[in-house]
Amino acid sequence: MTCPIILDCDPGHDDAIALILALAHPDLVPLAVTTSAGNQTPDKTLNNALRILTLLNRSDIPVAGGAAKPLARDLIIADNVHGETGLDGPALPNPSFSPQAITAVELMAQQIRKSHQPVTLIPTGPLTNIALLLASHSELHDKIERIVLMGGAAGVGNWTPAAEFNIFVDPEAADIVFKSGIPITMCGLDVTHQAQIMDEDIERIRAIPNPVAKCVAELLDFFMIYHRDPKWGFVGAPLHDPCTIAWLLKPELFDAQDCWVGIETQSELTLGMTVVDRYQLTGKPANATVLFGLNRQGFVDLLVHSLAAYTPTYLNRR
């Protein structure tokens, strides 16, 4: 059974790898790629999505840029993590095609409306575009199968002590999404910090004889630099965004629990916090499936086997 998807991303090293992972699997049918500001400015994240799709020879997938800033706040970017381009490291090709002359929200609505099956949305950046879609197209809610997002944490944050970056950038958007009533899978830091790629994993990827695997290895070489800071306590680099795709492909790799999740939009200390009611203390019904555990080796094996699919025949099939 195929699963139609729309990836809403802010590439970003781990966004790029999530996109590459998704497009290696024919069962995931990409209806569109949309971009948001976050890891870099909106012009750069849009260009990066086009560059990755050019590398994969997937100019058939429509692409559109989204909101230039959060719903109610100034833009924050993570250039300290992802570099000046947002994808520092490999020599990526220039885009071979142009984005659609419509907004991300318009493209998502168009593709959801046309789809014969409910569509799964996969946002791996701030949730601005998804919130705008839900607010402006309530008639399409029933055609959205699920939102599988990377964001939040039941424990500590990575941008502030309380908040994960994607949610902190646009907490008002996250609040809209989590209150939407649409099924949500939350891939937060609790699980993504377990999805660490080690040096030996990067060498395993580098040994795969195709240009896509080479690109991923070089992306990871750069991504490792930031995460070697001892303050994080990491052995490797956490691949946050690919957890969304891995859960869709192999949910058995993950431990999950249905929880109520609320978004803090007011507090000076905890702005952007995802308040996860793991012990049912609020009495509120669950609104998200929250991922807590991961089979790391199974995750790495899935990534490696997926990258091996990008043979010359596969890349030139269109």
From Swiss-Prot:
The keyword Transport does not apply. InterPro entries: I/U_nuclsd_hydro_CS, Inosine/uridine_hydrolase_dom, IUNH, Pyrim_hydro_RihA, Ribo_hydro-like. The active site is at H240. Pfam families: IU_nuc_hydro (PF01156). It comes from the Bacteria. Its EC number is 3.2.-.-. One of its GO terms (molecular function) is uridine nucleosidase activity. Keywords: Glycosidase, Hydrolase. Belongs to the IUNH family. RihA subfamily. Hydrolyzes cytidine or uridine to ribose and cytosine or uracil, respectively. PANTHER family: INOSINE-URIDINE PREFERRING NUCLEOSIDE HYDROLASE (PTHR12304), URIDINE NUCLEOSIDASE (PTHR12304:SF4). This is Pyrimidine-specific ribonucleoside hydrolase RihA. The lineage of its organism: Bacteria, Pseudomonadati, Pseudomonadota, Gammaproteobacteria, Alteromonadales. The gene is rihA.
